[in-house]
Amino acid sequence: VVDIGGGTTEIAVISLGGLVQQDSIRTAGDVFTSDIQYYLRQQHNIRVGEITAEKIKWAVGAVIPDLDEEPEPFIVRGPNLMTAHPVEATITHQEIAHCLDKSIAKIENSILHVLETTPPELYSDIVENGIYLSGGGALLRGLAKRFTDKVNIQFHVADDPLHAVARGTCEALKHTDHYQFLMR
């Protein structure tokens, strides 16, 4: 499981009711938002706030430049950094894929590290069943494809990835007798 939340990305291999291998990194949605703000300052000379950067992330957020269904470009307005005059810029998903590249690569490296340290007996199960993506970051266009291409294991976006962790926690709390390992 790879859960890309706001503050952290959690990568975990779970087997037979237990946590086998895991990693946690502070590269996640909040960093993506900051990446977008920085990119707009550097490439478009425009300053945007966190809320606007979030809107851009949801509207045209992508991690690969070639998508089957391309979103419409996002028009952003803000002050020019030099003159403070209002300016407008059209932002494409290709630009966002470019500006998120380094952060996504950090997550890929963490996934590879977890897989490298996973016992070989479990590795074949992972290859057979794939890896599930959850959290808001899982909604970035092209993420499952990029990870699949990088790791050569199929990645799947969980149903309702924004709430998957909360639903799983609720289920575990309903059936604590089956999930005692979670209560440690």
List each model region and its residues.
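Phosphate/ATP-binding catalytic cores across multiple sugar-kinase/actin-like superfamilies
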Residues: 99-127, 172-176
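Acidic, glycine/GT-rich loop-and beta-edge segments that sit at the periphery of enzyme/chaperone cores
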Residues: 49, 53, 68, 171-184
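Gly/Thr-rich phosphate-binding beta-strand-loop-beta motif of the actin/hexokinase/Hsp70
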Residues: 1-21, 68, 141
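Residue-level signature of catalytic and energy-coupling elements of molecular machines
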Residues: 3, 36, 111, 133, ...
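Conserved phosphate-binding/catalytic loops in two-lobed NTP-binding clefts
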Residues: 145-171, 179-184
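Phosphate-binding glycine-rich/basic clefts of nucleotide- and phosphate-handling proteins
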Residues: 16-101, 112
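Glycine-rich phosphate-binding loops at beta-strand->alpha-helix junctions
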Residues: 123-147
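Short, surface-exposed connector motifs at secondary-structure boundaries
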Residues: 18-20, 124-129, 151-154
